[in-house]
């Protein structure tokens, strides 16, 4: 039994609240245990300079933590005048995860800005941000369809993320902060609804891990991600059934 009473292969309690922010085209509050992240998606009718004239869109992400999202106050990065390496890494991870399931050509020359703000942190903030951001992105893209700007939602698949690790010799799913702090192996896994990997980040902390342990951790992550994608579908309701339709239409026309 784990610190919080969960089984080894059990996610924390997950809640996804849609349309959490009034002004954003898409927004959610995702809660995974005591970790809470606000994710918004904003549509901008232009692309970065490097993408101009390419006939396709772009997805970019920003990530930050409120000063008292943690046990002791963190100084805002804006006050420091620079973003940390950790923040930059997480922003890139979120962007890559989402671009992996978006048909950028079908999106057209527009940018979707994804903003992830951690309001309370208890481990797994980057994975929660990815899972929540996908829902916010889907809501924003659906709005473009409803407004007649896009014919279909340009999402090829679902995507979600979860952490796995080895703590006290046990392979466990969805680590909280206390578990993460003493994990011998810590891994973040990003996967699609069709069981394809977008990213795997795995590190041994003063330890190594075997191929067999890696395989078991990936299988554990796959189980958690399947459950998270089901929760994404529940949060999106009817919109969920229209995700991947463009791929289906392409297959039928071949």
UniProtKB/Swiss-Prot annotation:
PROSITE patterns: RIBONUCLEASE_PH
Source organism, top-level taxon: Bacteria
Reaction(s) this enzyme catalyzes, per UniProt: tRNA(n+1) + phosphate = tRNA(n) + a ribonucleoside 5'-diphosphate
UniProt GO MF annotations: 3'-5'-RNA exonuclease activity; tRNA binding; tRNA nucleotidyltransferase activity
GO biological process, one term: rRNA catabolic process
Positions contributing to phosphate binding: 86, 124-126
EC numbers on record: 2.7.7.56
The entry's keywords: Nucleotidyltransferase, RNA-binding, rRNA processing, Transferase, tRNA processing, tRNA-binding
CDD domains, A to Z: RNase_PH_bact
SUPFAM superfamilies: Ribonuclease PH domain 2-like, Ribosomal protein S5 domain 2-like
Function: Phosphorolytic 3'-5' exoribonuclease that plays an important role in tRNA 3'-end maturation. Removes nucleotide residues following the 3'-CCA terminus of tRNAs; can also add nucleotides to the ends of RNA molecules by using nucleoside diphosphates as substrates, but this may not be physiologically important. Probably plays a role in initiation of 16S rRNA degradation (leading to ribosome degradation) during starvation.
Listed NCBIfam families: RNasePH
SUBUNIT field: Homohexameric ring arranged as a trimer of dimers.
Entry's family note: Belongs to the RNase PH family.
Protein name as catalogued: Ribonuclease PH
